[in-house]
Amino acid sequence: MRKLTFILMGVVILMTLQGCSSSRGWYNLPVAEFDMIDYQYPVQTTQVRNIKVAYIDEGQGDQVILMIHGLGSNAKGWLQNIPELSKQYRVIAVDLPGYGKSDKGHYEYTLSFYAQVLTELLGKLHVDKAVWMGHSMGGQIAMVGALNHPDMVDKLVLISPAGFEEFTDGEGDWMRKAVSPEFVKDTTIRGIAVNLKSNFHRAPVEADFMITDRIQVRGARDFDNYCYAVAENVEAMLDEPVLERLGEIKQPVLVIFGETDRLIPNRFLHGGYTADIARQGADLLPNARLVTLPECGHFAQFEKPEAVNATVKDFLK
């Protein structure tokens, strides 16, 4: 029983290593390098700390939104939001180091490392201050950014953010053991598909690329380094808790959760309800607005883009 729970624990953490179709074509997809994946937008790159950082840069508005993806994902996680939000704002959707078209290596991979990289990226793009909009792990990175670099953060938009849930030392050790680079690498095609569905109340067909992209890069030259980054990022989220420091964040914060989020709280360690975790975190933020979306899972910005986009625009008025 313990072995089964151990395996399931790892699966739950890896919910953004995804897929959502039952097509037999999964098993016949050609191998692709990360740089070959179609992002539907021009992708630019720059050097930050001698690391190539890739990003989508759309829109011309005075306000800048920095979009930060979650664990195992990339800038394509914002494809349902970029078209609408870029009509009114400048939108920068980044591939964090270790992911997508950015460099992958044995970097520091702490949340503070990511916040520093993002701050330096904004400086290179001549952005003095931005709205940091993060999903899942990206939400926790955004909060670390607000704590470490408050002058660079105008407002926060946190979508299903990591960091609102507490874990004991024992639970943290268990999670670290559950997600190793080898575990990530050995995820089966079927496992990838199951993981994706757990991110949604009802997985939209528009999310199919998440499984096909993920399958294709399994044979990429730097896939091992991607797997290393995912495992290190699980540790990073545990090593830099933010819950007790939320009162230090003075910027206006929009918190968005799907009411049927299956990942928060962690169902294999904690009971309770998503609404309780969402309210717990929002109540600790001095200037926060909480919005919950019915019939919506963890990947709220992709499953309910119209509602998320409208809520974000109203918040940024």
Language-model segments: which ranges?
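Catalytic active-site module of serine/aspartate enzymes centered on a nucleophile-bearing elbow/loop
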Residues: L284-K317
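Conserved HGGG/HGGXW glycine-rich cap/lid loop of the alpha/beta-hydrolase fold
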Residues: I51, I56-K101
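Flexible "cap/lid" loop of the alpha/beta hydrolase fold
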Residues: M143-L147, L156-T187
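Short beta-strand/loop motif that positions the catalytic acidic residue
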Residues: I249, V255-F257
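Active-site loop/oxyanion-hole signature of alpha/beta-hydrolase fold enzymes
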Residues: Y39, V48-R49, I56, L96-M133, ...
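Acidic catalytic loop of the alpha/beta-hydrolase fold
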Residues: T260-G272
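Alpha/beta-hydrolase fold catalytic core
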Residues: R2-Q63, Q88-Y89, R279, P286-R289, ...
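Conserved alpha/beta-hydrolase catalytic His-Asp/Glu region
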Residues: D186-G247
